[in-house]
């Protein structure tokens, strides 16, 4: 296969739309890949990508890939995102070349409270900062998770209601200001996630994933289940209600 870059659109598809994000496109932010496609058509294209890779790389002649489950929200669904910090203190995503840092001043897939937070952040005079994770909980609680080159806490002035944590190079969190966790509610069950912990970025889709897993397993209370790479135990919590034993493993 080869990599290609669009030079000119001769006849646009009816499914082609104008990308909402000013950072979308060749040579720009590498985070999103389908903003030029109407969202109603995106699930089908994403399924085609999976089928193509299973055939081309995996060697499957007719892979049984089910239809993609669309998100109820095409925009403003991400509850957290991690930015790289360039030498000027700009918050950046990695570009389409997987190397260049692209400064980002707005991101339309972030939750509104995170977009508001992003607009207020200024790290121009903060030394040694390498990464910044912005995170929101179900109830709107906000957290910044900072990473530095030397694992030392940077000097900050915080004038907004946000907790701040430092994530060390060994992935251990150090609480600096406010809470050390954010909270999420999935299918009526609360989850607390520490700085650096993994949780699904799209809560409605997380609920859909749990439902699909439970439906597919069809547990009757006598089974032993392994939840591998379990994160904070999103699936484990619901599996444990239905199986005899659930073993949760995280790297």
Language model features: what each stretch is:
Residues 1-251:
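Accessory RNA-recognition modules of RNA-modification enzymes
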